[in-house]
Amino acid sequence: MAVLRSLLKSEDWMSLWIGLLIFALSLGLLVGADILGWAVKTNVWVSIGEALQPVSENYAGLGGGPSLVLTFLFLLILMTLAAKGLEANVPRFMSGFTVIFAVSYACWFLGHYAYIAATPDKLDALGIGWSMNLTGEAGYILALVVGLVGGAGIV
């Protein structure tokens, strides 16, 4: 019984179960069920209107903004259920998750700005003459800087 409790009541195991659930939902594509295709995808962008879109073409009519909201709500509900299972303070968790999601997605979004992220083969298609060539992963660098500055109490 103690082993079962540890499989359900530790953050490490809860992370594993959440990851496996999302992975299992994504396997729906193998049988033609596009279960998570509405999730948001961030493109390298020059114009903000081109930045967000659903992952799957099946949900292209949904648009980027609603796709981002649905992604946030899906993760908020899933993570809140996990936090409740871990007996966390749910209202505090939800507010903290919302702030962390907003800041981290803003970093990811800004990291995909074409002048930062475009690779040389994409410059002409984006209509720009230069780029820092960091790819979209520049959002990770930006998030690291924001985290270090925020963690140092500067923000």
Show which residues each predicted segment covers.
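Helical membrane-embedded segments and adjacent short helical loop/helix-boundary regions
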Residues: 4-155
